[in-house]
A protein has these predicted regions:
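Short, cationic-aromatic polyanion-contact patches
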Residues: 247-264
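A conserved mid-domain beta-alpha-beta active-site/ligand-binding segment of alpha/beta enzyme cores
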Residues: 137-209, 213
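A short, conserved structural fragment
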Residues: 237-248
Length: 264
C-alpha cells in the first residue's frame, strides 16, 4: 500500500446487503465513517449481454428461477442509478472482492463503469490468509466477517490495470446465453446451467435423501447459489431424473429426493 492511500476518503462497494452490513462493522473497527453501497446481482450465473442496459434478460432469468417479488427483482437487477451516481461522485471508490466468481466479476464490471476515472478506483481483495483452511473462493468478507476485513485493510491498493479489466468485462458480457461462471486460475470459465446436475443426482443415489442435505453438499464444495440448485432440482424432477416425495420444505423443494431407478 502506498502512502498516498493513507488519508483518502472512500465510498466502498461490495456485493450483496449482508456483506455491506459486515463491511460497515469493519469500518467502525477501523475508525472510518464512510458510505457503503451494495451492488447485489449475482453475476456468476445467467445472461449478461444487457446487464449494463437495464438487464431485462436478467430479470427474466431470475423470474425463471422462481423469484416472485417482481418489483424488488427489477430494482435488484437494474443498478444503472448506482453507477451513474458513482461516475459523478468525486470520492475515490474502494472495491471489496475475492476469488468468488460473483465478486471477481463485480470488480471487473466496476472497472468498466468507472473506466474514465481510473485513478479513483482501489480495491481490497480478500484471501484466506487469516483462515488457511478456507478455499479462496469462500474467503469473502460476507463469510469471514469483520475480523478478516480489518486484517485485509492494510492490503488495499489502487487498481493499475483498469482498462484491461474493463476490456475483460466487455468480452465476458458479450457472450450470449445462460451460463454458469467459475473462476479458475484467475480466468472466468463458462459452464452450462446443468453443470452441477450430476452432483445433485449423486447426492441422492443411495436412498431417499433430505433435499436440503443434497443441495448443502454442493454449496459446501462449490461457490454456487441456492436458487440455481433449487431450480435444477425442480428441473430434474420434472424430467424424471429424480423422484420426489413429501411436502414442500422452507426452501421450496420437495422434502426428499431419490435418483430414478434406485431401490430404497
Amino acid at each position: 500500500m502506498g502512502d498516498e492511500l493513507l488519508d483518502k476518503t472512500y465510498v466502498h462497494l461490495v456485493v450483496d446487503d449482508n456483506t455491506a452490513n459486515l463491511l460497515r462493522e469493519t469500518l467502525l473497527v477501523l475508525g472510518r465513517n464512510e458510505e457503503v453501497i451494495a451492488v447485489s446481482d449475482a453475476l456468476a450465473m445467467g445472461p449478461l449481454t444487457d446487464v449494463d442496459e437495464g438487464a431485462r434478460s436478467r430479470f427474466e432469468w431470475w423470474a425463471r428461477l422462481g423469484v416472485q417479488d417482481l418489483q424488488e427483482l427489477e430494482n435488484y437487477v437494474d443498478d444503472r442509478a448506482i453507477w451513474d451516481a458513482l461516475r459523478t461522485d468525486p470520492r475515490d471508490v474502494m472495491l471489496w472482492s475475492s476469488a468468488h466468481p460473483d465478486e471477481h466479476l463485480f470488480a471487473l464490471r466496476a472497472c468498466w463503469h468507472l473506466r474514465d476515472y481510473p485513478t479513483r478506483i482501489h480495491e481490497v481483495v480478500m484471501t484466506n490468509k487469516l483462515y488457511p483452511r478456507v478455499s479462496d473462493a469462500f474467503a469473502r468478507l460476507g463469510i469471514m466477517g469483520p475480523k478478516a476485513g480489518v486484517a485485509h485493510w492494510s492490503d488495499r491498493s489502487r487498481i493499475v490495470d483498469v482498462k484491461e479489466r474493463a476490456n475483460r468485462w466487455e468480452a465476458i458480457r458479450s457472450r450470449e446465453g445462460d451460463w454458469l461462471r467459475e473462476l479458475r486460475d484467475g480466468q472466468i470459465v463458462h459452464l452450462g446451467v446443468d453443470a452441477h446436475d450430476e452432483k445433485l443426482v449423486m447426492a441422492c443415489s443411495k436412498d431417499w435423501t433430505d433435499s436440503i442435505r443434497a443441495v448443502g453438499g454442493v454449496i459446501a464444495e462449490l461457490p454456487v447459489g441456492l436458487s440455481l440448485l433449487t431450480w435444477r432440482i425442480h428441473t430434474l424432477v420434472r424430467d424424471g431424473v429424480l423422484e420426489a416425495r413429501g411436502p414442500t420444505n422452507r426452501l421450496g423443494m420437495p422434502s426428499e429426493l431419490k435418483a430414478k431407478g434406485v431401490t430404497a
